[in-house]
Structures are given as C-alpha cells and as structure tokens.
C-alpha cells in the first residue's frame, strides 16, 4: 500500500517554488523620441504602454485633445491614423498643439496603402512623427509593393525615425500566403491551414525587417508585431516570433472586442506571453462602448502590468467580492470611491511622493478576511458585515490604529489615506517589499 507523504513534514533540501515572470527575452533597444522625452522599447526597459486615437486626424484640435487625455491617463506612446492628405497635413499642427500644452508624448503614424505617398508629399508630417507603423500587407503586390516599402524605409532613414513593421492576419500578404500554402501541400504531413497562416505572419514580419535593414534602416530602429484576434493563435505566433529574432515586440490582440470580453481576451493572451518574458510594449485594442472613455484601454494595459508585478502605476485597491455576510453595498462604493480618488491624485502624487504608485489599500466588507487583508495592505479598512458591531477598524502598516463609526466613514478614511501618503512617501520612505 502506498502512503502519501505528510505535507507538514519538512523537506530536506527543498527550495521554495519560483514566483514571478520569466526573465525578459533579450532584445535590441529602440528609442522613440520627441523633444526632451525618450521612450525606450526593448533592451532592459520596462514594458511600454501604448494607445491609439479614434478621432479624425484631419481634425487637429480633437486629435490633440484626445492624445493629451491618453497621455495623462498614462499612455507612453500614442498612435494616430494618417490615411489621407488632409490628415497628413495636420500632423505637424497636432504636434505643435501638444508641445504648447506641455505634452511630449511621442506620436506614431499609422500608415496603410498610401503611406509612401503621404510621407514623401508631406515632409513636415514625416518629421513631426516619432515613429512610423508600416503594414507590409497593405502596400500592393509584387514590384510595386517592394518599391512602396522601400520608399517608406528611405523616408524613415532620412528623418532618423524608428519603424514598427506590423503584420496583421486580416491583411496578410496574399502572395506570401499562397506560396506558403503551396509549400505546405508538398509536405509529407501537411499542416493545418491555421498553422500555415501563423508561420506566414512570422515570416512576413522577419523578412520585411531584414529587407528594411538592407535598405539602410538600423537594426535598433525596428519593432515587430504580428496581430491576430484569437488568443491561442496570438500566443503561438509570438512564441515563434520571439524564438526567431531579437527585435523588440509589440503585443496586442487585434479586434479584441467590447467590454469585459475584450478585456478578458486581451488579458488572457498578453498575460501568458508577458509571464514568459515575451513582449516589450503593449496596446489593448478595446472597442469603446457608445460614449465610452478612450482612456479605458490605457488603464487596462496598466492594470495588466501592475497586477502581474511587472510595473507600478497607481496604488491598487484590494476589495472583497461581497457575500451574504456583507450587510450593504457600502464597502463596494467605498472601494470604487477610493480607487477613483487614488487615480485622480496620481498626477500630483507621482512627482511629489515617489514610490506611492506601489502602495496597496484594502477595503473589506466583513470580519472574515477584512482584518487580515487590511493588515497585509499598507493601509486598510474592515467594514462591518451583517450582525457585526457597526464599527470599521483602520489598519496602517499592519497595526490597528483607529476605529471609524457613523455616517462619514468614507470621508474620514479618504483623509486618513491622504495623510498617510504625505507622511510616508513625502518623507522619502520607499515601499516595503
């Protein structure tokens, strides 16, 4: 008879399980610059958060306003569509408006079909952008495609701009795909069509990067992406791509969708890759709800990186989901109120209180886990549940400090949080690991 080992017995020579993401894959460092600001993608730099406007770029005022909103939300690079002469003509004006507002976030021009013409005809547009996104699948076919691609790379070299070669399965080079399918038909054991498509995406990205280098673009001025809209395909494509090259990689699940579906799908795909050390910059391609806030994609990107422990952007609130023990929705309202308060304060706190972005706050709804979670947090409050004494103890750095009662618990706790931030981080005390 076999017996299971008693898990309470100490193990000789046992090591604790590894915690944390795998080491980042080694990539070249690409510098995206504007004014006095440099955002490094790849190398040893942190994973960069990107976003994209959905305004008509020909409307310079609306586009500049949205770029500012995205930058203030935390986007470190913002991409804008450049699809018409009218749009290209306004890019320099958008850049000028942003500079006047003190917004030095680098702009990336997103080009399809006619980018070679627009960059050539509007040199002020080419200069005002910090980076170009090129989709080799939307540049025509045969020699025309090669000439158009070469023309865009020549402009990038002339203006010393980095380029993202972004391949998308919705616009994959038809000639390349046909060739890959033909090669597959001659295999002893042909691959399924989806596998051929994934291979074609990777081949397209890398071969175009090599061609760009042959045309004179520096290897440290190239970023690659291969976007698909299915989670498992994206994971497989980027694993393959990362194994075949050392260019920095831009991650994103294209057409992720709306609301919770888009957030869940993007998180499921990107979290796996980031955990494996793959990915140097990310963008969450959410379809906004009607009248929704475009900055939502920035917040989701930040939350993915922060919850994985890869970066810290804003203090995070831990809150219980609620159950039959919680007597009201007050703790939920308080958790939401505190998280919103923390985000509102971050533009000021980021410069005044270094390290505050790593602070953890707990807002709990009953005695079961409330005191424990509150002690684990930097600062926490445990609200009373059903049948409990109507009092809310506050814990600071693991110690119970004060008990709040009455109708003004929310206001009093917010004031305690603000005082704690000023005392702890204003004194230059770093966040405890």
From Swiss-Prot:
Its cofactor is [4Fe-4S] cluster. GO terms for biological process: isopentenyl diphosphate biosynthetic process, methylerythritol 4-phosphate pathway; terpenoid biosynthetic process. [4Fe-4S] cluster binds at residues 320, 323, 366, 373. The keyword Oxidoreductase applies. NCBIfam families: ispG_gcpE, PRK00366.1. It comes from Bordetella parapertussis (strain 12822 / ATCC BAA-587 / NCTC 13253). It is an enzyme of class 1 (oxidoreductase). This is 4-hydroxy-3-methylbut-2-en-1-yl diphosphate synthase (flavodoxin). Pfam families: GcpE (PF04551).
